[in-house]
Curated annotation (Swiss-Prot):
GO terms for molecular function: magnesium ion binding; O-succinylbenzoate synthase activity. This is o-succinylbenzoate synthase. It catalyses: (1R,6R)-6-hydroxy-2-succinyl-cyclohexa-2,4-diene-1-carboxylate = 2-succinylbenzoate + H2O. It comes from Photorhabdus laumondii subsp. laumondii (strain DSM 15139 / CIP 105565 / TT01). SUPFAM superfamilies: Enolase C-terminal domain-like (SSF51604), Enolase N-terminal domain-like (SSF54826). The gene is menC. Pathway: Quinol/quinone metabolism; 1,4-dihydroxy-2-naphthoate biosynthesis; 1,4-dihydroxy-2-naphthoate from chorismate: step 4/7; Quinol/quinone metabolism; menaquinone biosynthesis.
């Protein structure tokens, strides 16, 4: 016998979290719980405003439609909404024992705030020093100077940069001008520096700064291929789709010599712990990009190891639908 429950959550965000054009005040979504033959599985469905094509309401409706069919014994097709497809596929993988428990809780820390404090923190990091800097929010020249200072001050640091397609080619060149050519090989990659993929490829060729595809991975017709200057693809499962789709992309990337990086879409601690398990399972040699836990004021049901943040319990959540 199959039973299914959909729980709704709304967690307060820390002040100052801005996504493109709006301030994000709460993180909204659903936990899906599947039970069959004494086994159970869970997943998180949490479309990200400004980035997901679906709203939370649309995701909830699609999840209920899928759960109704599954509860009656059908094997419904994957939802066309990426956040729903991903969350349900995680629940099915747990239910069927296909999602390993071991996890990669390493994080590439997100660098923001006072550069002097950052340098101290980065120098004190143990193990492989990989960090991330969001760029493109301020002047390109300023971004270049900050990146250069970090690379100069921490000699064993490797940086992942993310520009979210925010620059013209001229602005991207302004950034590169302020990064010492001797340090550029320690930029692991710069995600989508320019507004078009052609401009980004030309930027990589002309500057020697490696790039990665992020938004492009979710564009219709995207093919994983080896290209000069491209070193990685970034996979954000909540925005991409089911585990099967993520596996397909990771396999294709590895087959052509590209790194595949599992990255957060500001999931709750519940979703982040599942992403850490997926990263350990599918991309064990790569540090995932999961340093977003502290953007939300509370954890959700499952704790992130070592975090002392308060936890919202399952019995505090509203039931959106139950079979």
């Amino acid at each position: 016998m199959r039973t299914a429950t959909l729980y709704r959550f709304r967690l307060p965000m820390e002040a100052g979290v801005i996504l493109r054009y709006q301030r994000l005040k709460t993180r909204d979504g659903f936990l899906v719980h599947l039970q069959e033959n004494g086994q159970q599985g869970w997943g998180e469905i949490a479309p990200l405003p400004e980035f997901s094509k679906e709203t939370v309401e649309q995701a909830g409706e699609a999840a209920v439609a899928w759960l109704r069919l599954w509860h009656l014994g059908a094997e419904p097709d994957e939802s066309e909404l990426p956040s729903v497809a991903f969350g349900i596929s995680c629940a099915l993988a747990e239910l069927q024992g296909n999602l390993p428990e071991e996890a990669d809780y390493r994080k590439a820390p997100l660098c923001n705030g006072d550069p002097d404090e950052l340098i101290v923190r980065l120098n004190n990091m143990s193990g492989q020093k990989v960090a991330k800097v969001k760029i493109g929010l301020y002047e390109a020249v300023r971004d270049g100077m900050v990146v250069n200072v970090l690379l100069e001050a921490v000699p064993d640091l490797s940086l992942r940069l993310d520009a979210n397609r925010s620059w013209s080619r001229a602005k991207a060149d302004s950034f590169a001008k302020y990064v010492n050519p001797d340090y550029r090989n320690r930029i692991a990659f710069l995600e989508e520096p320019c507004q078009t993929s052609q401009q980004s490829l030309a930027f990589a060729r002309d500057t020697g700064i490696a790039i990665a595809w992020d938004e492009s991975v979710r564009d219709e017709g995207f093919n994983v291929e080896a290209q000069a200057g491209v070193t990685a693809i970034v996979i954000k499962p909540t925005l991409t789709g089911s585990l099967a789709r993520c596996c397909q992309l990771i396999s294709a990337a590895h087959n052509v010599g590209l790194e595949a990086v599992i990255s957060s879409s500001i999931e709750t601690s519940f979703g982040l712990t599942q992403l850490a398990r997926i990263a350990h399972w599918l991309t064990p040699a790569t540090i995932p990009g999961l340093d977003t836990l502290e953007l939300i004021q509370s954890q959700l049901v499952r704790r992130w190891p070592g975090s002392t943040m308060p936890v919202t319990r399952l019995d505090e959540l509203a039931i959106a639908w139950r079979s």
